[in-house]
Amino acid sequence: MDNQGVIYSDLNLPPNPKRQQRKPKGNKSSILATEQEITYAELNLQKASQDFQENDKTYHCKDLPSAPEKLIVGILGIICLILMASVVTIVVIPSTLIQRHNNSSLNTRTQKARHCGHCPEEWITYSNSCYYIGKERRTWEESLLACTSKNSGLLSIDNEEEMKFLSIISPSSWIGVFRNSSHHPWVTINGLAFKHEIKDSDNAELNCAVLQVNGLKSAQCGSSIIYHCKHKL
């Protein structure tokens, strides 16, 4: 539209007053007048073109942001980055802590389940109890200490059914029953009276009990016999 306006103004330039006063004198005068008009039109066209370029430069310069505006834009950009970093910190860190807490709680529950509801590896389960079936031969006192180190006790008998089950697993093993002498009753390692019958109890040197296939028998406490451990769930 601006170019059209410039061309329009050039085409409608007012005639030169000097040229209006002059009267054409023949062909030579007409040619001179025409040349003057062309020269005048070219000068006006160049001037209009220069004005248009200057206006265009001024228009573009107005669109460019000034130094204070650039500073404000930079500050706003920094503030936005800080806010985004804060949001990420607020969202990510708590979720990470919650996940770690959940994992820790899960591990704790798993450990409790293994301790309370399941037997350790290489142990067998029977009637809510865990049993360690040993292969080493030790004295009664050494067997007692070995089971204590495993957070359990030397094998104990609660009923006849359990006795039959254990006698099938092992032909002979120490149990947690003893007496101070042949004149004292048989007691468990917890100090409770033992109710089941033990054979050969008249021998004064046999003050520790052994589980065998055919029942319970007394034996010398210093003998080397296989031991088993028991841990109740």
UniProtKB/Swiss-Prot annotation:
Motif Immunoreceptor tyrosine-based inhibition motif (ITIM) per record, residues: 6-11, 38-43
Transmembrane segment boundaries: 71-93
Disulfide bonds: 119-130, 147-229, 208-221
Ranges for region Disordered: 1-30
Post-translational modification: Phosphorylated.
GO function terms (MF aspect): carbohydrate binding; HLA-E specific inhibitory MHC class Ib receptor activity; MHC class I protein complex binding; transmembrane signaling receptor activity
Membrane topology recorded in Swiss-Prot or TrEMBL: Single-pass type II membrane protein
InterPro entries listed in its UniProt record: C-type_lectin-like, C-type_lectin-like/link_sf, CTDL_fold, NKG2/CD94_NK_receptors, NKR-like_CTLD
Range of residues in the leader sequence: none
GO annotation, cellular component aspect: external side of plasma membrane; plasma membrane; receptor complex
Extracellular compartment spans: 94-233
Top-level taxon of origin: Eukaryota
Domain C-type lectin: 118-231
Subcellular location: Cell membrane
GO biological process, one term: negative regulation of T cell mediated cytotoxicity
Keyword set, alphabetical order: Adaptive immunity, Cell membrane, Disulfide bond, Glycoprotein, Immunity, Innate immunity, Lectin, Membrane, Phosphoprotein, Receptor, Signal-anchor, Transmembrane, Transmembrane helix
Gene3D superfamilies the UniProt entry points to: Mannose-Binding Protein A, subunit A
Phosphotyrosine sites (modified residues): 8, 40
Main location (coarse class): membrane
Pfam families, sorted: Lectin_C (PF00059)
Record's comment describing the protein's domains: The cytosolic N-terminus contains two immunoreceptor tyrosine-based inhibitory motifs (ITIMs), which are essential for the association with INPP5D/SHIP-1 and INPPL1/SHIP-2 phosphatases and functional inhibition.
Quaternary structure and partners: Heterodimer with KLRD1; disulfide-linked. KLRD1-KLRC1 heterodimer interacts with peptide-bound MHC-E-B2M heterotrimeric complex. Competes with KLRC2 for its interaction with MHC-E. Interacts (via ITIM) with INPP5D/SHIP-1 and INPPL1/SHIP-2 (via SH2 domain).
Job description of the protein: Immune inhibitory receptor involved in self-nonself discrimination. In complex with KLRD1 on cytotoxic and regulatory lymphocyte subsets, recognizes non-classical major histocompatibility (MHC) class Ib molecule MHC-E loaded with self-peptides derived from the signal sequence of classical MHC class Ia molecules. Enables cytotoxic cells to monitor the expression of MHC class I molecules in healthy cells and to tolerate self.
Name listed for the protein in its UniProt record: NKG2-A/NKG2-B type II integral membrane protein
